[in-house]
């Protein structure tokens, strides 16, 4: 059998590759909360809209039309058979899914909750500076919990990053 010999350059490259792989494998790992339970809410269907409006008004630098919003199917404060929660994508807003989510809600006679995901829709010098995966996941969990208050059965609609969040939370 013929012995394969590697040049000095290939040996250095392979050794470097092995070192990089070891450093990567032993390096820091992000700490992600594995608790996928939805938060307990301190609001009722009668007070949810006021609560969300007040919370959004406290956000400094909130861009126009980026606030979380409930669109009632019929009458404010009344549950419907279905509600739709729309989780938007990275750096997007509720308008990313328009007009699809509006038409879906209308077709199903559903209440529609359009949340603003954590740190999104805010005018800042350094956008998303304080955003972490846990904070983003928590805001999606809250959105789902609020949406469940509005209905008997929840329909989750999402795009892009919102889709990743929806799949992650639905996996439990």
Predicted feature residues:
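N-terminal Sec-pathway targeting helices
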Residues: 2-18
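Extracytoplasmic/secreted proteins, especially bacterial periplasmic and envelope-associated proteins
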Residues: 95-99, 135-142, 164
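Membrane-interface motif at the C-terminal end of an N-terminal transmembrane signal
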Residues: 19-35
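Catalytic nucleophile-loop/oxyanion-hole region of alpha/beta-hydrolase
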Residues: 122-150, 155
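Gly/Ala-rich beta-loop-alpha elbow adjacent to hydrolase catalytic centers
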Residues: 157-166
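N-terminal cap/lid segment of alpha/beta-hydrolase-fold proteins
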Residues: 37-79
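Conserved hydrolase catalytic core segment
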Residues: 168-172
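Short, surface-exposed "cap/lid" segments of acyl-processing enzymes
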Residues: 63-117
């Amino acid at each position: 059998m013929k012995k394969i010999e590697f040049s000095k350059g290939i040996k250095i490259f392979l050794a470097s590759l092995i070192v990089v792989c070891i450093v990567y494998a032993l390096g820091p790992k992000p700490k992600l909360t594995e608790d996928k339970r939805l938060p307990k809410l301190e609001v009722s269907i009668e007070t949810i809209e006021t609560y969300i409006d007040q919370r959004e008004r406290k956000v400094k630098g909130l861009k126009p039309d980026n606030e979380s919003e409930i669109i009632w199917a019929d009458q404010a404060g009344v549950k419907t058979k279905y509600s739709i929660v729309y989780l938007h994508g990275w750096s997007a807003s509720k308008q990313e899914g328009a007009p699809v989510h509006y038409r879906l809600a209308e077709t199903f006679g559903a209440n529609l909750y359009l949340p603003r995901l954590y740190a999104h829709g805010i005018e800042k010098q350094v956008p998303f500076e304080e955003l972490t995966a846990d904070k983003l996941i928590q805001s999606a969990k809250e959105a789902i919990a609020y949406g469940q208050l509005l209905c008997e059965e929840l329909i989750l609609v999402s795009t892009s990053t919102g889709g990743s969040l929806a799949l992650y939370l639905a996996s439990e």
